[in-house]
Amino acid sequence: MRFAARVEYDGTGFAGFQVQPGRRTVQGELEAALRSIGGGERIRIDGAGRTDAGVHASGQVIAFTWSGRVIAAKVLGRAIRAVLPPDVTIGPLHRVGIGFQPRRAAVRREYRYTIWNGPRSPLRERYALGVRERLDVSAMDSAAVALVGRHDFSAFGGKHIQPIRTLYGVRVRRKGRVVTVDVAGDAFLRQMVRSIVAALLRIGHGEATMADLEAALRSPDRVFAGQVAPPHGLCLRRVVLGGDPPVSIGKARG
């Protein structure tokens, strides 16, 4: 039997999603939970996205194949949640086809980067980047239009054999002292979203313009600013799955 579920986690204490020897990861904790209730059998977790160290998620999608005794999805989900640590949980389990792979099934991924644009606030800045100087959000949002569409994003991510990606939308909004950068695309290069945020922050500070973004897209061998925004402000909020019919998986609550 193969199951899929939404996963939510606080990335603060993790070295990323993907298993890494000797380091605490989201995949590692999920596989440990399955191993503990599956009699010690190694059960591999597959994820829709490989978030970096410190990055959070409220809409990650995972899947695994359960070969243990026949058990209702609701009961198995409850057992998994009971042994997971406090900083990660899964939503209701859904039966999927044996060949279902979240990474291949994902047709859209949505991230949000949160900025606290005000006086120092230890509580707010646990999940948001603190920026003291007032940002020009209008300039940031206007410039972000240049990034929408299908481009070579080499300048905004690590080296990749296929750097062509499609962004469906990039929006920058302000609500009081909270500024959010929402980025939606088909897939992302490593640190691509945080590099985009760093570039938009330069524009918000008046240090760069929309023309600079356009130049970076035309010259993919040049890393834009060579900087990435810190991970703690970033959250993978939603993964849209394709298929015929599209796969539908509920939120990470249970």
Summary of predicted features, one role per range:
Residues 1-254:
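Structured-RNA-binding interfaces characteristic of tRNA pseudouridine synthases
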